[in-house]
Amino acid sequence: LQTGDIPMDKVMAWVMTNPRQNRKLFETALYQGLDQLPEQIPALTEFFNLVEHAPSWFDASKLETAIQLTHRLGSNGTYIMRDLSLMTGYQYPGFNQPLIITGALKKYAGKRLAETHKWWLDVTQLNSFERFNSGFTSTVYVRFIHALVRFQLNKSSEWDRDVWGEPINQYDQAMTNLAFCSVLLLGVRA
């Protein structure tokens, strides 16, 4: 509950020293590569050197099998994700405090669903996690947005860290992962 996304939070601390300029530099590194930056930027170099290399436990064949399963589900998978995984998850107020405080559930619910759906489509394409493919860039960009929200909420008087922990913390991310995986599997059995 007390840990966010340390590597991306370091990037966000750097971005917020000059938000307009540094966000553009981050996006250049994400979508075009570090070699397209005007100079080496240690915060970005450290982060991208980390995420551009798969962890030792990663098994590409298992990921490919999972992606093929999602393709076999067709539109049923999308409905289960929207109507069961997301809607069930949105019912937990503690877990969703970042969405509630930022207005993402009230004012921007449709946009939030569309963004999540786009991310899902991006990560369920074959080879999507290769460096410049959509699954990779979408996932890193989601991490960026989460770090931005975390940065802002940590400055907000509305955020009760003693009750909710770090905004968009590792525990909440694990619960999201369970909703997107386990609930999907339960839904297809129904």
Where are these regions (language model features)?
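Mature, function-bearing regions of proteins
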Residues: L1-A190
